[in-house]
């Protein structure tokens, strides 16, 4: 299943401005927040702090490229995009993507999509 996942390093090859913005968000340091509390390998925590846990990787030694909340956590999987972005575009990020992790069962923060989205929403792409 690893071949289905694109890491932020792949996206950064074309989407430099978006990657630079992402690096300044809490999503880019999501895994570190687990390390601080010693919870980085807790089964009920890790899936929301990495990309593809349980499919792209399971073993801790394979985690490095998937650490943190990355582009596909929000945008969804799209393995054909780098080779053919015109025919494999991403749609807008939907609230349901956020609610996978930002819900009453996973976090203590009262999540309001319209308020929180702007904190992590990457700059719009410049189209020709």
Per-region residue spans from a language model:
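Short sequence/structural segments immediately N-terminal
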Residues: 1-128
């Amino acid at each position: 299943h690893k071949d289905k996942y694109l890491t932020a390093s792949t996206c950064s090859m074309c989407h430099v401005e978006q990657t630079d913005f992402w690096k300044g968000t809490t999503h880019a340091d999501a895994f570190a927040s687990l390390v601080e509390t010693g919870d980085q390998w807790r089964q009920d925590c890790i899936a929301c702090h990495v990309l593809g846990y349980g499919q792209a990787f399971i073993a801790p030694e394979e985690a490095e490229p998937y650490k943190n909340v990355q582009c596909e956590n929000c945008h969804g999987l799209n393995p054909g995009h780098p080779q053919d972005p015109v025919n494999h575009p991403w749609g807008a990020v939907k609230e349901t993507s956020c609610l996978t992790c930002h819900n009453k069962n996973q976090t203590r923060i009262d999540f309001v999509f319209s308020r929180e989205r702007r904190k992590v929403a990457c700059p719009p792409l410049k189209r020709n």
